[in-house]
Amino acid sequence: MSTTVTPVTPGTIDLSGTTQVSMLQLSRVELRKALDTRAGRWFAIAIVGLVLLVEVIYAVTAPDNAKDYGDFLGIAGFVLGYFMPILIIMLVTSEASQRNGLVTFTLEPRRARALVAKLAAGLLLAAGVMVLAAAVAVVGTLLGSLTGGSPVWSVDANLLFNGFVLANVVGVFIGFAIGTLLMNTPAAIVAYFAYSLILPIAVGILSALSSAFEKVAPWIEFNTAQVPLFTGDYTPSGEEWAQIATAGVIWMVIPLVLGTMRLLRIEFK
């Protein structure tokens, strides 16, 4: 006895009407991922809290003629400059350390778009923290006026842009570069502290021992090159901008390119 079997035609899935996830939506998801974890959320709160603590200490201990809003804003920028990159590192390395990579790059297979969205989220997060820090600087200035100061509320434009905004944006890219290069949260944080704390000390010692190295240091060490952004009139000269650019290529651009290439090729398990 034989049975007639009707051939089955393979079906197809029509995706022509499916719209791609927008970059704005990807950035919102990445921003939410950064703050949905307890570590990311509380670290962001801790940064703002640390800025407030330092501002209060400065308001109580600083001379009366050094309690202008620009002074408190500069201090806020200095504190953010050290800890903001860690927040960005935690955002970038979450794909590997929290094993989110399989989900992220399944929902958005084009890793370059996901990476750009992550960078955009990092910049938005940094902008939010900077706004809060600027508000905390207002509180510090008011407290300074209560402790004997006569604050000036106007802020030098170079301090605002170079010493506060630009310096912290550079910090975001440094954290992003280290995070993508290592893709491991503890290792990236250790590497960042080695870069931001140990390396400047070593360069300072070598500069003290060798005048020739002292002249070369701003061209090859990014922390040293950025000093004009925080000191003096907050306006680097033409040569100092060239030093910032050269050292930035070494310590920021090259690691970022290598880290991006690694993230685009790494196999998540």
For each of these PLM feature ranges, what is it?
Residues 264-269:
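Short cytosolic juxtamembrane segments of multi-pass membrane proteins
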Residues 39-42, 100, 113, 187:
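Residue-level recognition of membrane-helix boundary sites in multi-pass small-molecule transporters
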Residues 185-220:
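Transmembrane helix segments
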Residues 4-20, 25, 40, 47-89, ...:
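Secretory targeting signals
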Residues 67-71, 88-107, 111-112:
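Transmembrane helix boundary and interhelical loop/hinge segments in multi-pass membrane proteins
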Residues 23-35:
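A short amphipathic helical element positioned immediately N-terminal to and/or at the very start
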Residues 30, 108-110, 178, 184, ...:
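Generic structural signal for small/hydrophobic residues in well-ordered secondary structure
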Residues 33, 93, 104-106, 175, ...:
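Helix-capping/transition residues at the boundaries of transmembrane alpha-helices
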